[in-house]
């Protein structure tokens, strides 16, 4: 039996010790995806769709190429394993050995090249893929986030949420916001597409959470046009994109979305607190969204409204495998997180 490239993940009502007597947070646990993050949805969808209708001339099976320092590469590797496809992932030298082993264990060939993702990506596209094409193979380039077919796959998260709310007899007007972390804007774009398809994009505001040091969306919004970050300094490395997808930037103002930027210290504190409370280890990219569960005043301030007992906020816990608990403790110690 063929494996699926993604799973329907639970949407769980969770109570947070945040000073409120009742919790209105429903958390969507994307860490339970085959690749450990939401990226299994979109990247898996791109690979499956391309495998059915190959993008380039050639013969034989589709050869998949991904450049990533972590989660996107793991998503590509696990998706390819489910379809019995060859997968090559180029990672920069900064990638943790543990993450390299994870990607290799999922069946991919891993090449370490370059000091950052840009150099790894350049090597992948202009050297490895060129060599493969010369051998007559059908090739697919998998960008970590900036691809409409990937967004289409990510949009299934909205369909699931609507279905799960219905199963729990929760009416959509009770949902006051949907919170997600933003790096390059892949997840955000998928959520917007899913909400729009279900005629909810103008009814449910999306709160985009970033960390200072890789807050490319917020900086672009302040300038009024997309910017490119010269340096990416946040501990939330999975959010470290030098640019925001143009669709994400354009959709933000079109649909009245909200932007929140958090410090590394706040996000790390939340990751450790969440691990203590729920025995779930989340990396900082995921902890950024969960931070609002512990600090609902941030949410009420950005939405400019009170959230009442009967209201609901959806949190996308995007997942990710880039940090262990020990990594979180070490980073917290370095940044003097109390």
Curated annotation (Swiss-Prot):
- State the needed cofactors, names only: pyridoxal 5'-phosphate
Chain positions found as N6-(pyridoxal phosphate)lysine: 39
Q: Which reaction does it catalyse?
A: L-serine = pyruvate + NH4(+)
Q: Which domain of life is it from?
A: Eukaryota
Q: What is its main location?
A: cytoplasm
Record flagged with keyword Signal? no
**Record-linked InterPro entries:** Ser/Thr_Dehydratase, Ser/Thr_deHydtase_PyrdxlP-BS, TrpB-like_PALP, TrpB-like_PALP_sf
Its subcellular locations are: Cytoplasm
- What are the alphabetically sorted keywords of the record? Cytoplasm, Gluconeogenesis, Lyase, Pyridoxal phosphate
Q: Name one cellular component (GO) term.
A: cytoplasm
Quote the EC number.
4.3.1.17
Query: Which molecular function term from Gene Ontology is one that the record holds?
Result: threonine deaminase activity
SUPFAM superfamilies in UniProt? Tryptophan synthase beta subunit-like PLP-dependent enzymes
Q: Which residues form a coiled coil?
A: none
Question: Which CDD domains does the record match to this protein?
Answer: L-Ser-dehyd
Question: Which pathway is this protein assigned to?
Answer: Carbohydrate biosynthesis; gluconeogenesis
Q: Name one GO biological process term.
A: isoleucine biosynthetic process
Family as reported in the entry's similarity comment: Belongs to the serine/threonine dehydratase family.
Q: Which PANTHER family match?
A: CATABOLIC L-SERINE_THREONINE DEHYDRATASE (PTHR48078:SF2), THREONINE DEHYDRATASE, MITOCHONDRIAL-RELATED (PTHR48078)
Name of the molecule in the record: L-serine dehydratase
This protein's encoding gene: SDL1
């Amino acid at each position: 039996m063929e494996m699926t490239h993604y799973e329907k993940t639970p949407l769980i009502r969770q109570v947070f010790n945040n000073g409120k007597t009742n919790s209105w947070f429903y958390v969507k646990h994307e860490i339970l995806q085959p690749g450990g993050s939401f990226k299994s949805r979109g990247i898996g969808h791109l690979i499956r769709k391309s495998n059915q209708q190959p993008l380039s001339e050639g013969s034989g099976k589709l050869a998949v190429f991904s450049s990533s320092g972590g989660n996107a590469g793991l998503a590509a590797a696990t998706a390819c394993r489910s379809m019995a496809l060859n997968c090559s992932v180029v990672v920069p030298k900064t990638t943790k050995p543990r993450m390299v082993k994870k990607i290799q264990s999922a069946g991919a060939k891993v090449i370490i090249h370059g000091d950052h993702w840009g150099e790894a990506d350049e090597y992948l596209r202009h050297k490895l893929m060129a060599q493969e094409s010369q051998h007559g193979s059908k090739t697919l380039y998998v960008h970590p986030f900036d691809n409409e077919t990937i967004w289409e796959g990510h949009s299934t998260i909205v369909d699931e949420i609507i279905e799960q709310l219905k199963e729990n007899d929760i009416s959509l007007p009770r949902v006051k916001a949907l919170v997600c972390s933003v790096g390059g804007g892949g997840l955000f774009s998928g959520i917007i597409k899913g909400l729009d398809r279900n005629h909810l994009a103008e009814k449910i505001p999306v709160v985009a959470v970033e960390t200072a040091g890789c807050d490319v969306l917020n900086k672009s919004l302040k300038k009024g046009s997309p910017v490119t970050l010269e340096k990416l300094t946040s501990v939330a490395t999975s959010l470290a994109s030098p640019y925001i997808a143009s669709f994400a930037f354009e959709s933000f103002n079109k649909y009245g979305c909200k932007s929140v930027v958090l410090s590394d210290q706040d996000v790390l504190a939340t990751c450790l607190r969440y691990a203590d409370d729920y025995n779930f280890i989340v990396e900082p990219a995921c902890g950024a969204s969960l931070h609002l569960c512990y600090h609902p005043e941030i949410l009420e301030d950005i939405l400019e409204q009170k959230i009442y007992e009967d209201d609901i906020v959806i949190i996308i816990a995007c997942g990710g495998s880039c940090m262990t608990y020990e990594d979180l403790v070490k980073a917290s110690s370095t940044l003097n997180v109390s």
